[in-house]
Amino acid sequence: MSATAFPTLSTPAGEIPATAPAWNRQRRSQMPSHRYRDVHSRVAVPLTDRQWPTRRLTEAPLWVPVDLRDGNQALAEPMDPARKRRFFELLVAMGYKEIEVGYPSASQTDFDFVRLLADTDLAPDDVTVVVFTPARRDLIERTVESIRGITNPVVVHMYTATAPTWREVVLGHDRAALRALILDGGREVLRCAGDLPTVRFEFSPEVFNLTEPDFVLEICDAMTELWQATPQRPVILNLPATVEVATPNVYADQIEYMHRNLARRDSVILSVHPHNDRGTGIACAELAVLAGAQRVEGCVFGNGERTGNVDIATLALNLHAQGVDPMIDFSDIDEIRRTVEYCNRVEIHARHPYVGDLVHTAFSGTHQDAIKKGLAEHRARAAARGVPEREIDWRVPYLPIDPADIGRSYDAVIRVNSQSGKGGIAYLLESEYGTVLPRRLQIDFARHVQQHTDDTGREVTAAELWSLFSAVYLREGEADAPQADLGNRLGIDGVVASGASAAELGAALRRHGVELEVLAVHHTTVTGELLALVEYRDGAGVRWSAGRGRTAGEAVGNAVAAAVGPATAPARAVAEVRPG
């Protein structure tokens, strides 16, 4: 490709680093990377004997969807009351037991929604309601006003940014002044809501992942002391990766440091809130749970500011795929998707994990062949054990989970385009029409499909595959195509031969001067009708034909008739029928 094809790009033309191996010919680019500092020069992580790498995920953390607050703030068009209510009802139906419902001091819509929960039975008794507030007296008072009368458990979630850049540039405070501001906010929360028996408290040191570990530990310990955290009334300490800045192992180290050094650890629910700026929010959350986190905040399908909050649906289904109960129901993921798209007015990408339109779809020929064989083995194993297919271990290649677990069918698992092979083609014909092609016919038909997709550049549907198959092998509707009746009388250019089997038909053909060697006959069906597949040799080489019928004899007769039609170069032949 010429350098002028993309004139807005500057192809790297610097030197090849002296340390680069001979096989790596990348050159230094013109990207201004020198403007940025790596995370290790911005914040220290005093953890050297980390334990999280040897741990395993064996149970789900407490999932806390923040779609109605954090996710809602990120929408170009925030949810109206009807959409907020619909989303809340979805979260309850899925099984979430702690839901952040809004920022009542920031908007009247959020305040009114919290009051709706107070005035109705929309929130089941076992669902905890979380409300969000900055550490400001007037906003804390407004927040607590919104929750009065709610009989459900309530969490008042207070936050303040603590990282150096935020302290100095945004808030204009040093460490001591910010500590005082946070504790003043904590006292206001205690003054306004401390006597409410169903209320617990949560604190988030915003931008935790860029805050000095000793400072954030000092503040968190001061908050749990102020709020008198006990095992009976634990405090949630939520540690956000507000802007993702490092590889997930760094965040895991930071979480483990807090987990191992917090005071009153048995009275703390350690929570995380990863974002996805580097595209590794999922990994950050999973490693954080290994490191000691017990609670994860995020959004269903990952909506949120910039590149989004961590996707708690993907996190849950990752556990499901490892044999761990996610404690949330995804049995109709397409209904969940429709609701989330309606409420957020944001479409979900076709490749989004688990929920995207194409995540269970294979176009690649090698993938299709493996999936087809895996599904066949799965069915056979279930039949051999005499148990339903849904009850045996899932081990189909390229499909991490059974699509049926989340309400998907197998209809879209295999789709055919120019990258596809015989396995996918055969699978579609079998799944849509009940037609099982023998391997040699799969190979032959794949050549015709490849030519068709190369010519059109389009995906081929199952209906189009069958139309192409009919044109190539059945030859139905052609003016010169011979026909066979129920008695297997074969008309070839006015010459009538009779036969009750493929071998006899072949012999009859030879008696009338048609040299056709029948190599094999296979029997299958097409939408309930009998279908015969005949492999034969004529002057043009080895070929295939097909015929439909109400009886096996009629189907075979029609298949031989279709074979005779294109036979133009007679060759010496010996009639032979081999079992298919």
Swiss-Prot record:
Residues 1-11 have a biased composition (Polar residues). One of its GO terms (molecular function) is acetyl-CoA C-acetyltransferase activity. It holds the Pfam family HMGL-like. Keywords: Amino-acid biosynthesis, Branched-chain amino acid biosynthesis, Cytoplasm, Leucine biosynthesis, Magnesium, Metal-binding, Transferase. Mg(2+) binds at residues 70, 273, 275, 309. GO terms for cellular component: cytoplasm. It is found in: Cytoplasm. The keyword Transferase applies. Belongs to the alpha-IPM synthase/homocitrate synthase family. LeuA type 2 subfamily. This is 2-isopropylmalate synthase.
